[in-house]
Swiss-Prot record:
GO BP term, example: outer dynein arm assembly
SUPFAM superfamilies: WD40 repeat-like
WD repeat extents: 214-254, 261-302, 360-399, 404-444
SMART domains: WD40 (SM00320)
Name assigned to this protein: Dynein, 70 kDa intermediate chain, flagellar outer arm
Keywords, alphabetical: Cell projection, Cilium, Cytoplasm, Cytoskeleton, Dynein, Flagellum, Microtubule, Motor protein, Repeat, WD repeat
Length: 567
């Protein structure tokens, strides 16, 4: 039965907006059940039916083609010269130019094009397109939420996956290259047939490495040379220091002799400030700091054991900090025991090369960096915390300490573009961005980079891009938001004032603790004076007198009287 409703509207009302209103209910149809049809109904018995109790799901797959980037170039040196003209000879080219300039077609074409080109030049000169309407404009990023964006990911091309143990950016900030050292540092956990290669990657071509370093032992740390960027220094697992030249094949150019090298893996090294740029220093868990020169690798320039003053026990070094702003001979070493050694290479007395030792961490220190805007303050990362220290012999405690994280910290560093920002990476695969300019008690941003442990970290010179290595060999390149990479005008002064305030607070606390200890000693002295002071001689005299009184052989006492009565 078809149900329809007729709506009539005049032609003149077409195009007007309708105005609807509420009306009462109206019955349009009333269909009663048919009893004859009901009598013909027969129930089916048995009934076969199928029921699906789980949610319906379908499988979808997508296979995207990887974008493979290849750099190609063509050198066209001949130019547009004819074959009979030698472009290397100036006389031939001048003679040919004069010949062409006398051609009638050339003259007519230049005259025709000259008028149109002249109009375009006048239009370009009419308006100064390079005029700056607003100068010294400061960007306000306070309203922008901090965030990061993944630029690319470098994956270890080998089947046996190794950890990205060290990451270092190219010293030239305009060159987007990263050297990544791959290794398995766990003792006796290296599988058979494990590759030893480490790679230099180009951010613009993440599919294939730009250069492969093939060492004699797996590389634990690698850094670009600061003066000659074609050289890459590498600290190896067997304790040797080698350097590679990207222009001279994949093997090391030269390496230190095994008998005078470290006895443990080289966990960190630094290029020193020198005229040639070939001097460097290495640190290892064997307890020694060694200095080398690439021009003479067959011998060690200098050796320094890591031990405190008036102590014969050496401690193993894990990380190294060298900053020319703090002095070309000053450096710091983070140890396995959680101590920070502040050293001076050129001390007059060899015993005084270790200036002082700071303690505070409960485990190895994996990160140690000075603030790039004020080298007096430095950051240490170890156990479950990150701590900010001041290089002052009067302050032996950190001026700032982060909260204890539920997982272990594995690295981090300061931001090179903002004085109050530093980064930490953790074993749970998260990266924390701390902004001391806004808050101290918790990180400004936490990014879950991977489900696996983060093992290496480095920041580009511009401060806007970071590289994070994981335990499965992946290296993620992340781009920070402008609020995390660009400093505000008064940030440096405010951060320095905050550090000075915290330093003064620590000094006042230490002064109060010393005064409390002196007061406690005085109270203890007063209590000792109240007690009965008996000397050792007086105690000896009282003891002898007691034994004489109670001894029977002397003739006195209870035993002597009893014997006389028996007689």
């Amino acid at each position: 039965m078809e149900i329809y409703h007729q709506y009539i509207k005049l032609r003149k009302q077409f195009g007007r907006f309708p105005k609807f209103g509420d009306e009462g209910s109206e019955m349009l149809a009333d269909i009663r059940p048919n009893e004859d049809h009901g009598k013909e109904y027969i129930p089916r018995n048995p009934v076969t039916t199928v029921t699906q109790c789980v949610p319906e799901m379908s499988e979808h797959e997508a296979n995207t083609n990887a974008v493979i980037l290849v750099n190609k170039a063509m050198s066209h040196v001949e130019g547009g010269w004819p074959k009979d003209v030698d472009y290397t000879e100036a006389e031939h080219t001048i003679r040919y130019r004069k010949k062409v300039e006398k051609d009638e077609d050339y003259i007519r074409t230049v005259v025709q094009l000259g008028s149109s080109v002249e109009d375009l030049i006048k239009q370009n000169n009419a308006v100064d397109i390079y005029q700056e309407y607003f100068t010294n404009v400061t960007m306000d990023h306070t309203s922008e939420a901090p965030h990061v964006k993944t630029v690319t990911v470098f994956k270890d091309p080998n089947n046996i996956k190794r950890s990205a143990s060290y990451v270092n950016w190219h010293p030239d900030g305009s060159v987007p290259k990263v050297v990544v050292a791959y290794s398995i540092l766990q003792f006796q956990q290296q599988p058979a047939g494990m590759p030893l290669s480490s790679y230099i990657w180009d951010v613009n071509n993440p599919n294939t490495p730009e250069y492969e370093m093939v060492p004699t032992s797996q590389i634990c740390c690698a850094k670009f040379n600061l003066k000659d960027n074609n050289l890459v220094g590498a600290g190896q697992y067997n304790g040797q220091l080698a350097y590679f030249d990207v222009r001279k094949g994949n093997g090391p150019v030269e390496a230190t002799p095994i008998d005078i090298s470290h006895r443990d893996p080289i966990y960190d090294f630094a290029w020193l400030q020198s005229k040639t740029g070939t001097e460097c220093m290495t640190v290892s868990t064997d307890g020694n700091v060694l200095w080398w020169d690439l021009r003479k690798m067959n011998e060690c320039v200098e050796n320094m054991p890591l031990k405190e003053k008036n102590s014969e026990t050496t401690v193993g070094g894990v990380c190294l900090e060298y900053d020319t702003n703090a002095g070309p001979t000053n450096f710091m070493v983070g140890t396995e025991q959680g101590q920070i050694f502040s050293c001076n290479r050129k001390a007059k007395n060899p015993v005084d090369r270790v200036k002082y030792v700071l303690s505070g961490h409960h485990g190895p220190i994996y990160g140690l960096r000075r603030n790039p805007f004020n080298s007096k303050y430095f950051l240490s990362i170890g156990d479950w915390t990150a701590r900010v220290w001041v290089e002052d012999t009067a302050v032996k405690t950190p001026i700032l300490t982060t909260k204890y994280h539920p997982t272990y910290l594995t690295g981090g560093t300061w931001s090179p573009s903002r004085p109050g920002v530093f980064f930490t990476i953790k074993m749970d695969g998260a990266m924390d961005v701390w902004d001391l300019y806004y808050k101290h008690n918790e990180p400004t941003l936490t990014v879950q980079v991977s489900d696996l442990a983060l093992t290496a970290f480095a920041v580009q010179e511009s401060g806007g891009t970071v590289a994070v290595g994981t335990s499965d060999g992946c290296t993620s390149v992340l781009q920070l938001s402008t609020g995390l990479s660009e400093a505000s005008p008064a940030e440096k002064a405010n951060i320095n004032a905050m550090f000075e305030r915290e330093t003064t607070r620590e000094k006042n606390l230490e002064k109060a603790i010393k005064e409390a200890k002196v007061k406690a000693r005085k109270e203890q002295g007063r209590r000792d004076e109240v007690k009965d002071n008996v000397t050792e001689e007086q105690l000896k005299a009282l003891e002898d007198e007691f034994f004489k009184t109670t001894d029977p052989a002397v003739g006195g006492g209870y035993g002597a009287g009893e014997g006389a009565a028996a007689e």
